[in-house]
Amino acid sequence: MWKAGSMSAELGIGFALRAVNERVQQAVARRPRDLPAIQPRLVAVSKTKPADMVIEAYSHGQRTFGENYVQELLEKASNPQILSSCPEIKWHFIGHLQKQNVNKLMAVPNLSMLETVDSVKLADKVNSAWQKKGSPERLKVMVQINTSGEASKHGLPPAEMAALVEHINAKCPSLEFVGLMTIGSFGHDLSQGPNPDFQVLLSLREELCRKLGAPPEQVELSMGMSVDFQHAIEVGSTNVRIGSTIFGERDYSKKTDKPAAELQAPEEVAQAH
């Protein structure tokens, strides 16, 4: 039985990445043919991990990395060793973003995607900040949905999804809407059937594609973490966020420098990715 973090800690990041990518391909092979034939993107979540681990993962072919905290992402992405050793690195921000931290996030080198837009006000703030940055490319964004309805999870209610996406498309010219993201409830028993939170996100994509007149291939789904990424891919995820299975278990006792405004609910911190 694979235990998240155990094999990576014992045998190294390169071994762990190969094993994860093999499991990704196994899940793709089990995916129903009526789902979009999109190769899932692996986001290596490096929160609490040092720069040398990012560089090691990059040396083994990993290009996309994710972080949950703005300050940690800014420090890591600005690290001179990462900048020199990882010229093609792409950073995804996957944590809760408060409006007062938007300008700091926009300063992150090689920021590729913001996966957690959850309000019109946040979308407008990010759009304005990205415009001021003067980037020639639009910033890719996903809309985060709270599919489980848990108070400890961020994201907007499913019923508000379409209005926010339409606002981004119509009023945020510096942003490129690319998909939907969810965390979902933890510990779902697959013997009881597919994860209902993932099913909600699939249904929302169907609804959105009807409204936009767009094929499902144009709306990504970011769902699935270390404990459930294979199931997520099997039901349609195109973006999985995996941390401890690649980098080993995290030691949160050493992360005491995060502002209180950036701290997530305890359950989300302990179990996500």
UniProtKB/Swiss-Prot annotation:
Give the N6-(pyridoxal phosphate)lysine positions (modified residues): K47
The answer on whether this UniProt entry bears the keyword Zinc-finger reads: no
Biased region (Basic and acidic residues) positions are 251-260
Q: Which family does it belong to?
A: Belongs to the pyridoxal phosphate-binding protein YggS/PROSC family.
Residues with the Phosphotyrosine modification: Y69
Q: Does the keyword Phosphoprotein apply?
A: yes
Q: Which UniProt keywords apply?
A: Phosphoprotein, Pyridoxal phosphate
Q: What's the stated role of this polypeptide? A: Pyridoxal 5'-phosphate (PLP)-binding protein, which may be involved in intracellular homeostatic regulation of pyridoxal 5'-phosphate (PLP), the active form of vitamin B6.
Q: Which GO BP terms sit in this record?
A: vitamin B6 metabolic process
GO MF assignments = pyridoxal phosphate binding
State the source organism's domain of life. Answer: Eukaryota
Q: Which HAMAP family match?
A: PLP_homeostasis
Which PANTHER family is this protein grouped with? PROLINE SYNTHETASE CO-TRANSCRIBED BACTERIAL HOMOLOG PROTEIN, PYRIDOXAL PHOSPHATE HOMEOSTASIS PROTEIN
Cellular component annotations (GO), alphabetically ordered = cytoplasm
Residues the record lists as N6-succinyllysine modifications: K125
- What is this protein identified as? Pyridoxal phosphate homeostasis protein
Spell out the residue ranges making up region: Disordered. Answer: 251-273
